[in-house]
Amino acid sequence: MPITSGADADEATDFETPMIKTDELRTARIDSLITPAELAERYPMTPAVADHVLDARRRIEKILNGDDPRLLVIIGPCSIHDPEAAVDYARRLARLREKYDSRLEIVMRTYFEKPRTVVGWKGLISDPDLNGSYRVNHGIEQARRLLLEVNALGVPTATEFLDMVVGQYISDLISWGAIGARTTESQIHREMASALSCPVGFKNGTDGNTRIAVDAIRAARTSHMFLSPDKHGRMTIYQTSGNPYGHIIMRGGKTPNYHAAAINEACEALREFNLPERLVVDFSHGNCQKQHRRQLDVCDDICEQIRAGSTALAGVMVESFIVEGTQKITSGTPLTYGQSITDPCLGWDDSETLLDRLAQAVESRL
């Protein structure tokens, strides 16, 4: 068919077929999203909180480097669904931070995004009303306000970075970050980790594979180019300098991997690439085989390893809340205050016991 040109082309335009839509066939616009800059202006970080975040990051980096013999403890609810209960928990944790300051670096787990194997509630930011209404602007405001309040109490915060955009809204308030078991192998999450200003832990795969976490650490230590909105919502090409504080989180898989043999095996994999032989053990998930009270058993084993002189154990993770266990979201039924709506957690009394055991074990390092 000959190409139409000149006057013929002008005439042809009058009879052009209307454009057929081939994109956005499965999406519907919900709302405009506030920009990170607008949110930070609405809920600004104070100089005192900024100093607190930077100081906490430096302390965590020293622990990961082996320059501080204390133990990093990431502890808190599986996920945040009730900011009021989260602040209540943070106040309790602040007292224990002060009590165990010479032995433990206690950081509160403040997870706002939940990865799902198939479907389920995806976290406070996505669905703050717990009803599928997806008021993301409200959720992201609640998350930032909570982080400001918890940090103002003197408690550093930790979170999992899942969505590639959410970090722009809250990462300035985070002292330690995690990349989850389902995303550790993802290239874009490794690139994001290389850009983050806080230390980042990579979980082993859901099947227990630690090699993907080692590869993620190596990738995150190098420079990357990636595309992302900036604080004002403009699409931007970024170059990262790399994150030297990546580390493995041993979270178990089909079987637990907190035992000394598994820790030694992970250290050998790190040694192969001249990476620091320091790691964090998750007491929950595959290591407790979804039985939340077994976190206390995992704790006892880790305490014995610390007393036996293990230098690999830089930190631990614990799922803990005010009330033990978990609950389901049921329409018309009020939720139990201070109890998880995702993974079951240890209650407050058991959490105090666990922290005391860890503090006593760390005495042998000092």
Task: Give the positions of each predicted feature.
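Conserved, mostly hydrophobic/aromatic
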Residues: 76, 281, 347
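Polybasic, low-complexity association/targeting segments
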Residues: 13-31
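Gly-rich Lys/Arg/Thr-decorated short loops/hinges at beta-loop-alpha junctions or inter-strand turns
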Residues: 36-44, 240-252, 335, 339
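Active-site-facing alpha/beta catalytic cores
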Residues: 18-24, 90, 103-258, 262-263, ...
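Internal helix-turn-beta structural module
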Residues: 321-364
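N- or domain-start disorder-to-order transition segments that initiate the globular core
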Residues: 25-64
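Conserved phosphate/anionic-ligand binding catalytic regions in large, soluble enzymes, centered on
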Residues: 72-85, 343
